[in-house]
Amino acid sequence: MLIHRIEIVFTSSRDAPLRVRTFLNELTYVFPNSIKINRGRQSLKDIIAKSIYLNSKYLVIIDVIKGNPGRFRVYDLTSKMLKYNFIIYGVTLLTELKLHRTLIKRGCIGKIEDQKIKNMLIDLGYIYIENCDVYANGDYIIKDNNYVFELKFTKDDKILGPVIRFQLYDRNKNIN
C-alpha cells in the first residue's frame, strides 16, 4: 500500500467550534498532502510531537476568535519557529456556498498580489505551472471600510475551497 508523505498538519486552538472544524476540513482538501488533527484538549507540545512523528514540514494552527477562524499561524517544524502569522478577517465556507469539496492533488499559484501570502502558498506546496487541479488567486479588497487580502481557490471560475480574507500581520515567535 502506497502512503503519501504528510507535508502539512492542520489543527485548531483547543475545543474549536463546528465552523472552525469545517474550515479545517475544507483546507485539507485544497492543500495537497495535508491532514487535520483534532486538537481537543491536547497541548501544543503534543500536537507538535505528532506532527514531527508524521515527518511533516509545517504545522498550521487556526485560532478561534468569537467562534470563528481568527488567526492563521504557520509553524516551520524544522526550525520550530512561527513562519507566518495572519489575522483572518473572515471566511466563506464551501458549505455556506452550497458547493461540494474536491480533493486537490496539485495546487498552483495564479494571480497573488501579496508577497507574504505568495511565499506562504509556496511553502505549503503550491507551485508555478500551467496544468493544475486548483489555482490560488487573491487581491486586495475593501471590506467594511477595511483593506483586506482575499484569497480564493478556483479553477475555471469555479470556487473549490474556502474564501479567506486576511488582515496582514507578522511576528516572529519560537514554539519551544
Curated annotation (Swiss-Prot):
Coiled-coil ranges per UniProt: none
4Fe-4S is among the record's keywords: no
Matches recorded under Gene3D superfamilies: Probable brix-domain ribosomal biogenesis protein
Every Brix domain range: 6-176
Molecular function as annotated in GO: rRNA binding
Gene Ontology biological-process entries: rRNA processing
Keywords (A to Z) from UniProt: Ribosome biogenesis
Classification via InterPro entries: Brix (IPR007109), Brix_dom_Rbsml_bgen_prot (IPR023548)
Function: Probably involved in the biogenesis of the ribosome.
Name listed for the protein in its UniProt record: Probable Brix domain-containing ribosomal biogenesis protein
Naturally occurring in which organism (per UniProt): Sulfurisphaera tokodaii (strain DSM 16993 / JCM 10545 / NBRC 100140 / 7)
Lineage: Archaea, Thermoproteota, Thermoprotei, Sulfolobales, Sulfolobaceae
